[in-house]
Amino acid sequence: MKIDIVSVFPEYFEVMNLSLMGKAQAKGLLEIKAHNLRDWTHDVHHSVDDTPVGGGAGMVMKPEVWSECLDELLGFSQPSGSPAPSGAPVLIFPNPSAPLFTQRDATELSHADHLLFGCGRYEGYDARIPDYYRAQGVDVREYSIGDYVLNGGEVAVSVMLEAITRLMPGFMGNPDSIVEESYTGEGALLEHRQYTKPAVWRGIAVPDVLLSGDHGKVDRFRRDEALARTAEIRPDLIAALDCKALDKADRKTLMALGWEVSAAHPRRLAD
């Protein structure tokens, strides 16, 4: 996968040379390049922002600078009104006002050949930028990573990039480690809690069933704990489950937790 990142702080992404991300690049699974947006400016101050039209606090990133940068990285030979070239990357902007980035999005994007991330700063980028490239046929995505605001898009891009790339074949040393993670699969649940040795630490014991050696009982315990944790922390995920996909033990656990499971989707009895 080829990944281009545009930022006014490209050095922020030197961290991508560490750990599994660095190993993936060394193996040729990833090609990551960070670009400095200021390289496409023409004034002595290398300005990338201007005051907001209509007034207001802060500064807004200028479309002229972004368009020169994106035209080049997207492969537009004739920028004005030309359609997106074949094989153009998916263009992704972090935006706190956009739909939430989810594991489903990460899974979809992990199959892409080329991703281009644009990191906003200040009050953000001119709203016409994503609109323009959508109109040219580019696959433009805008995502939020949560209900909060950051100083810039670099942190959000790092979060999305790690969530996406770790799903690529060959990225993880043990591919089985992602199978039972939180939010994974159609019947997405929060993952069960994890323990390691010693069996008793500071007076707190690992659940006995995990030491039993009975893999069936261990699997059931973990499944029940995942259902219980999800019901408590993210009941919306329980409500999205398909009751037809639940086995008898799942139904029994959910009923004990106060959920009705006779309809298409579980429903809390208190609702």
From Swiss-Prot:
Q: What is its main location?
A: cytoplasm
- Supply one GO BP term: tRNA N1-guanine methylation
Show the Pfam families listed in the entry.
tRNA_m1G_MT
The reply on keyword Methyltransferase is: yes
| EC number(s) reported in the record | 2.1.1.228
Keyword terms, alphabetized: Cytoplasm, Methyltransferase, S-adenosyl-L-methionine, Transferase, tRNA processing
Catalyzed reactions per annotation? guanosine(37) in tRNA + S-adenosyl-L-methionine = N(1)-methylguanosine(37) in tRNA + S-adenosyl-L-homocysteine + H(+)
| Keyword rRNA processing among UniProt keywords | no
For the ligand (S-adenosyl-L-methionine), the binding residues are 120, 145-150
List cellular component terms (GO): cytosol
Localization of this protein? Cytoplasm
| GO terms assigned for molecular function | tRNA (guanine(37)-N1)-methyltransferase activity
Q: Tell me, what does this protein do in biology?
A: Specifically methylates guanosine-37 in various tRNAs.
The UniProt entry, under NCBIfam families, shows:
PRK00026.1 (NF000648), trmD (TIGR00088)
Q: Assembly and partners?
A: Homodimer.
Which HAMAP family does the record cross-reference, listed alphabetically? TrmD
Q: Which family does it belong to?
A: Belongs to the RNA methyltransferase TrmD family.
Protein name, UniProt field:
tRNA (guanine-N(1)-)-methyltransferase
